[in-house]
Amino acid sequence: MQVLSSLKTAKQRHRDCQIVRRRGKVYVICKSNPRFKARQR
């Protein structure tokens, strides 16, 4: 999982990527290709 300052580019890496907010942090999850997972500080 990458820690990024901006998740806009992380969301555009794959068409299945979606932005989720959990416990005050913003995550990008991708079910079909989990290597695109990312988290914002």
Curated annotation (Swiss-Prot):
One of its GO terms (molecular function) is structural constituent of ribosome. Keywords: Ribonucleoprotein, Ribosomal protein. SUPFAM superfamilies: Ribosomal protein L36 (SSF57840). Pfam families: Ribosomal_L36. GO terms for biological process: translation. The keyword Ribosomal protein applies. Signal peptide: none annotated. GO terms for cellular component: ribonucleoprotein complex; ribosome. NCBIfam families: PRK00831.1, rpmJ_bact. Belongs to the bacterial ribosomal protein bL36 family. This is Large ribosomal subunit protein bL36B. The gene is rpmJ2.
